[in-house]
């Protein structure tokens, strides 16, 4: 998963 998946 990319950082964007965690909303960062």
UniProtKB/Swiss-Prot annotation:
Predominant place of localization: secreted
Coiled coil stretches, renumbered: none
Residues that bear Leucine amide: 8
Record has Protein transport as a keyword: no
Gene Ontology cellular component list: extracellular region
Domain of life: Eukaryota
Keywords from the UniProt entry: Amidation, Neuropeptide, Secreted
Localization per Swiss-Prot or TrEMBL: Secreted
GO BP annotations listed: neuropeptide signaling pathway
Similarity-based family: Belongs to the allatostatin family.
Functional summary from the UniProt entry: May act as a neurotransmitter or neuromodulator.
UniProt protein name: Carcinustatin-7
Source organism: Carcinus maenas
């Amino acid at each position: 998963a990319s950082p964007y998946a965690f909303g960062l």
